[in-house]
Amino acid sequence: MTLDSYDKLLGTVLQEYKILTEYKRLQSEDLGGIYVIPSHENSFVWFGVLFVRSGPYKNGVFRFTLTLPDKFPNDSAVPTVVFQSETFHPLVCPYNGTLELSEAFAKWKSGENHLWQVLKFIQYVFAHFEEYMAVAELTANNVAHELFQQSRADFLQRVEECVRLSQAKVYDPAPVQDRNYIVFEQFDGAVHGPVLESMKQGRANEVGTTPPSSGLSWVKEGVFQPLSKQG
C-alpha cells in the first residue's frame, strides 16, 4: 500500500467515525417523534420519518432523506433534507421536496453544527409552525407562504390534505433496496401484541419518575441560533 493510499484510507475511516459519532449523539438529545438511520449501503444517506405531534401538521407522517456532503463534516456545505411525498409547507420546495435550511444554517461549521440540530429544526418548523413563521424570512414554496398569509382557512385545508396523503403512504413499498430503510407494517395482534404489552408495562413502571428537562428550544428569543439553552 502506498503512502497516498494509506492516507486516503485513514481519512475515510476517520470520516466514517465522525458520522457514526453524530448518529450516536442523537441518543442524548430530545428527539421524540423523529427517527433516522444511516443507509446500509451509504453512510452519507440517512433515512428519516417525522411524526408530527402538534400544530397544523399534527398526525402527519413524513418520510425524508438526509444527505451529507462528500467532505462532511469538514465542509461548509449544509446537509440536504428532501421529503419523499408531496409536503405542502412554505419551507419545502414543491418541485423536489427539498427543505429550506439556509436561514438556520447559512453554512456548515464543523464542531459547532451537528446533525441533531438539523433534526431539531425539522421538528420545530412542523410542530411549532406558526411560531417559526412569525420570524421566518425565507421561503421555498411561495404558494404555501402566500396562502398562509392571505387565506388561513385555505392553507389549513391544503395542509390537511397533505397530512392525509402522508398517512396513506406509510405502508408503501420501499423505493430503494436497502436493509436499513424504515418500513412499517399493519398491526398484527399475534405478532405485535406482546411487544405492545411489554411497552405498556415498561411505561407503567416509569410513572412517578420524571426525567430532568434539557431546557432546550430550537431558538432563543431574539437570537437565531440553533438550540440555544434557555435561561
From Swiss-Prot:
It holds the Pfam family UQ_con. The lineage of its organism: Eukaryota, Metazoa, Ecdysozoa, Arthropoda, Hexapoda. Belongs to the ubiquitin-conjugating enzyme family. FTS subfamily. SMART domains: UBCc. CDD domains: UEV_AKTIP (cd23814). Residues 14-168 form the UBC core domain. This is Protein crossbronx homolog. It comes from the Eukaryota.
